């Protein structure tokens, strides 16, 4: 599957549903 939580979260927020910020990268919740 494709990584859906790979965005960076320097602002402390993830914009992908079901993801949480594991600074500095969003990870699956």
Swiss-Prot record:
This is a cyclic peptide. Disulfide bonds join 5-19, 9-21, 14-26. SUPFAM superfamilies: Cyclotides. GO terms for biological process: defense response. The keyword Zinc does not apply. PROSITE patterns: CYCLOTIDE (PS51052), CYCLOTIDE_MOEBIUS (PS60009). Keywords: Disulfide bond, Plant defense. There is a cross-link at residues 1-29 (Cyclopeptide (Gly-Asn)). InterPro entries: Cyclotide (IPR005535), Cyclotide_moebius_CS (IPR012324), Cyclotide_sf (IPR036146). Coiled coil: none annotated. Belongs to the cyclotide family. Moebius subfamily. Probably participates in a plant defense mechanism. The presence of a 'disulfide through disulfide knot' structurally defines this protein as a knottin. This is Cyclotide mden-B.
